[in-house]
Structure formats: structure tokens, C-alpha cells
Regions:
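Bacterial carbohydrate/catabolite-sensing allosteric modules
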Residues: 1-136
């Protein structure tokens, strides 16, 4: 897992209690209160997608914590929800349109016999952080 690898690389402890499998808004509503009640409450959340991050954001606000002063929140996808949340959500833009266009081009090439179907194709699509109001 990238998160754990980054911690280990920087000689930081991996606290499994802070890692939750949560990929949707409803699960974020269920799991975030548990994390916020820990003795050493997290001061930041990174979510697998923007919908999950919005769930975290809503729980944090409902608990009376100030975003981003007390808790920072970052999503991943940079979809339209990030631009209408309150506060506006910081998110990693994964360039989904470009990803889809490349995938479709590769599929069409394979279907047309231009590409060997047994060959694995690896493409790197760079992401970028879109900083808004939910992080400091």
C-alpha cells in the first residue's frame, strides 16, 4: 500500500488503527466518528475518492471541528463534488477523461489487431494536487 510504503520510507510508524477500508459516502459516515474518537485523533484524512472525503467532511463538521484548522481533508478524483462542498475540497486530480481516452484507444487498437492482446501495456498518467479550502 502506497501510504504504508511512504511511512516506512520516511521511518515513520504505521498505525493500522488509522487505516480503514472505506470507499463510499455511507461508509465514511460510519467510520469517521470512530477515528475522531481515538485518544490521538487524526488531524488529516486522505480518502480514496471525493465522495468518501465529503462523507468525512460532513462528520467532521457535525462534530464541531474546524476544517482545515483542526482537521484537513483530501479526496482523490477531483470530481464536481470537490467544487461545491463547504469548504471546497482539496483533491488529487487523476485526469479521468485522459485515462478513459487512452484506455479506449488501446482497446480499439487491440480489437483492430494493431496491438497484440497478450502484451501488457503500461501507461503512466500523472496526477496533480488541486488545493482548495479543506487543507492547510
Amino acid at each position: 500500500m502506497g501510504y504504508e510504503d511512504a511511512l516506512r520510507k520516511n521511518v515513520l510508524p504505521v498505525d493500522k488503527e488509522l487505516i480503514k477500508i472505506c470507499d463510499n459516502y455511507t461508509e465514511a459516515l460510519r467510520l469517521t466518528p470512530e477515528l475522531l474518537s481515538l485518544p490521538n485523533r487524526p488531524d488529516a484524512f486522505f480518502a480514496v475518492n471525493d465522495e468518501t472525503a465529503i462523507g468525512v467532511l460532513n462528520v467532521v463538521k457535525a462534530k464541531g471541528l474546524r476544517i482545515p484548522d483542526e482537521v484537513s481533508i483530501c479526496g482523490f478524483t477531483n470530481n464536481s463534488l470537490a467544487e461545491v462542498s463547504d469548504p471546497l475540497l482539496t483533491s488529487v486530480d487523476q485526469h479521468g477523461y485522459e485515462l478513459g481516452a487512452i484506455a479506449m484507444r488501446l482497446l480499439i487498437e487491440r480489437l483492430n489487431g494493431v496491438r497484440d492482446g497478450d502484451r501488457i501495456v503500461s501507461k503512466i498518467i500523472k496526477t496533480n494536487l488541486v488545493v482548495r479550502q479543506s487543507t492547510r
